[in-house]
């Protein structure tokens, strides 16, 4: 019942239930449908992981091929830069960039690629290219006068790509988890809905304390499914491209 102090006045009331399950994925403490954030966050998470994996892998592949082919001071310089970069704390640097510079997803993506280029992959690819460099077809290409660029990009790099595909596929979810980790720490892009941002808002809104477990479980489940799916695909591709596992 309602009481008014003016004759002929009317009251319009609407019942609002905060945090109750409504729609496909439920709502948060501000009555926003979580399915919208989860659906919008899916292509963003996958695109972040894909671009980071592509940028890192291709750059490492080219740098390793150039380092192996030319050798000398170029190879020594790249190895020293790699050794120094591997000592640097990766996550704290990203936290500093997000805290003091910018939390834009494009800035974070560029920083992740730049910090990941001179990593352990450089040394792994270099060891593979050392074997390819001594192959007979490389000697044949050198004997008929092929240029350095042609040998690197036409004969060396394509030779290694099939062996890198399984590892490349498995690398994508690691960058998806990295972006989500930064968002959970409050360093995600405030203008873009991501899975990590949903978990961060669930923590800030007291989801577990208020019994809204779905608010945390749904994005966590999507992250788990993403990692599992790429792991299965990477394992299957490894059995296809790895000659040692092909007959098993």
Q: Where in the sequence are the language-model features?
A:
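Membrane-topology segments of multi-pass transport proteins
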Residues: 1-30
């Amino acid at each position: 019942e309602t009481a008014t102090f003016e004759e002929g006045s009317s009251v319009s009331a609407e019942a609002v239930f905060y945090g109750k399950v409504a729609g496909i994925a439920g709502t948060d403490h501000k009555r926003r449908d979580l399915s919208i954030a989860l659906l919008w966050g899916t292509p963003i998470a996958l695109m972040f992981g894909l671009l980071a994996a592509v940028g890192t892998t291709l750059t490492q592949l080219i740098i390793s091929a150039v380092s192996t082919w030319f050798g000398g001071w170029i190879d020594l310089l790249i190895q020293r830069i790699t050794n120094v970069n591997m000592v640097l704390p990766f996550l704290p640097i990203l936290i500093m960039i997000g805290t003091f510079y910018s939390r834009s997803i494009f800035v974070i993506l560029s920083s992740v690629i730049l910090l990941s280029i001179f990593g352990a992959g450089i040394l792994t690819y270099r060891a593979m290219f050392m074997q390819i460099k001594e192959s007979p077809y490389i000697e044949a290409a050198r004997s008929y006068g092929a240029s350095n660029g042609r040998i690197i990009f036409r004969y060396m790099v394509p030779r290694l790509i099939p062996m890198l595909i399984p590892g490349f596929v498995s690398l994508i979810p690691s960058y998806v988890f990295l972006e989500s980790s930064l968002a959970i720490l409050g360093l995600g892009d405030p203008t873009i809905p991501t899975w990590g941002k949903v978990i961060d808002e669930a923590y800030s809104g007291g989801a577990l304390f208020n019994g809204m477990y779905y608010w945390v479980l749904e994005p966590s489940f999507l992250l788990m499914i993403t990692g599992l799916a790429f792991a299965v695909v990477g394992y299957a591709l490894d059995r296809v491209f790895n000659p040692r596992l092909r007959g098993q």
